[in-house]
């Protein structure tokens, strides 16, 4: 890798969760490959050898999910005894907030905000009410500030629960 011979090509495939050494990264050209939604579903179905929608309510899957995120969601549901096929997205969010799983589970630590955004976006598109658009905008801003200033996530999620899920 340091001084490869002529016509030598290395392909390094990497899971984004694990970082390569900076010395290796500096010698690489990065290609970020992104699957479209249909390919994500197709790839997930191939990995599972089954149809993903037999196990998950479509409201819980986003067009931005990866096959790994969908499979991790299935694993998360098995660990926490959640029936993803029958649970609605608002029931799912309430369950996560009540059990504080956004603090306890690595998958939820990194993906919970996307479920919150998806639910708010669903409210905005379904109802066409300005109230939800303002809440969506407010949540995005508060979420960014929470991350930027390392603020308490619990107050953010309780505020979300009170204003959106119970409001």
Residue ranges and their predicted role:
Residues 8, 38-42:
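Short, surface-exposed, polar/charged, turn-prone segments marking secondary-structure boundaries
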Residues 1-12, 19-22:
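Conserved catalytic/switch belt of AAA+ P-loop NTPases
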Residues 42-167:
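AAA+ P-loop NTPase domains with strong preference for DNA replication initiators
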Residues 15-18, 35:
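Short acidic/polar capping segments at secondary-structure boundaries
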